[in-house]
Design a protein with these regions (language model features):
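S-adenosyl-L-methionine-dependent methyltransferase catalytic core, i.e., the SAM/SAH-binding region
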Residues: 1-239
């Protein structure tokens, strides 16, 4: 076994460095790991006070503090909406910018208070923590998570032997959407318009879908590991 400290988006370079042209299987377990979430000092949690970090790899330069304190209001609004699916994105982005004009936003709980202040009373009464979506959005931006998933998916199929399988576990809908789309595209083959009588693009399917619908956790798994409640597994096999 060889352990490699790298981003899975670099799967081509990783395999090249190991002298491995192709493999019989790949399993990608996306998202933040439990040890990262449970270590309050990493800044992923909205339940404990810590510096605004959120880097999965501490060697990376961009931190949540830089995003919160330096990115333009419009860009903050975009990531909150696109990556967090936060309906109060405009209000939260504006509140962050007002707060940082007075003093830098330095900790997770400072950010939580700013987010709370921007949301209406009814939203604060919802079961979900008011900062959950915003923290997800900032974390995704810090780590370029969706870009990494896209690059990994586009590279991984090409490094599988015939009959090799690609299995990907996602933990939120944005990741799953990318994985589903990339697998379907690889399984589709021809991309000619439907009105064409014969194929002229020459594209052939690269994989077959092993799972038409994602596999989700059962009751026994959820009892043992509640964090698996949002996990989805999709599998494709190289042709």
């Amino acid at each position: 076994m060889t352990l490699v400290h790298s981003n899975f988006a670099e799967i081509d370079a990783i395999l090249d460095s190991l002298g491995i042209p192709a493999v019989d299987g790949m399993l990608f377990d996306l998202g933040v790991s439990s040890p990262q979430l449970d270590d309050a000092s990493r800044g992923f949690s909205y339940m404990a006070d810590a510096p605004l970090d959120m880097r999965m790899d501490k060697d990376d330069a961009l931190t949540a503090g830089e995003v919160v304190n330096t990115w333009p209001q419009g860009e903050l609004r975009r990531i909150l909406y696109d990556y967090g699916e936060e309906r109060y994105a405009p209000q939260i982005a504006a509140a962050i910018c007002r707060a940082r004009e007075k003093a830098p936003v330095e900790t997770t709980l400072e950010l939580v208070d700013i987010i709370r202040s921007a949301m209406p009373a009814q939203a604060l009464r919802e079961k979900q923590h008011p900062a959950k979506r915003s923290f997800q959005a900032i974390r995704i931006a810090v780590n370029d998570e969706l870009g990494a998933v896209s690059r990994m998916m586009q590279a991984a199929v090409g490094r599988l032997n015939p009959g090799g399988r690609l299995a990907v576990i996602t933990f939120h809908s944005l990741e799953d959407r990318i994985v589903k789309s990339e697998m379907q595209q690889a399984a589709r083959g021809c991309t000619c318009p439907p009105e064409f009588p014969v194929c002229v693009c020459g594209k052939k399917p690269l994989v077959k879908l092993v799972t038409r619908k994602p596999i989700v956790s059962g009751p026994a798994e959820l009892e043992e590991n509640p964090r698996a409640r949002s996990a989805k597994l999709r599998v494709a096999e190289k042709l």
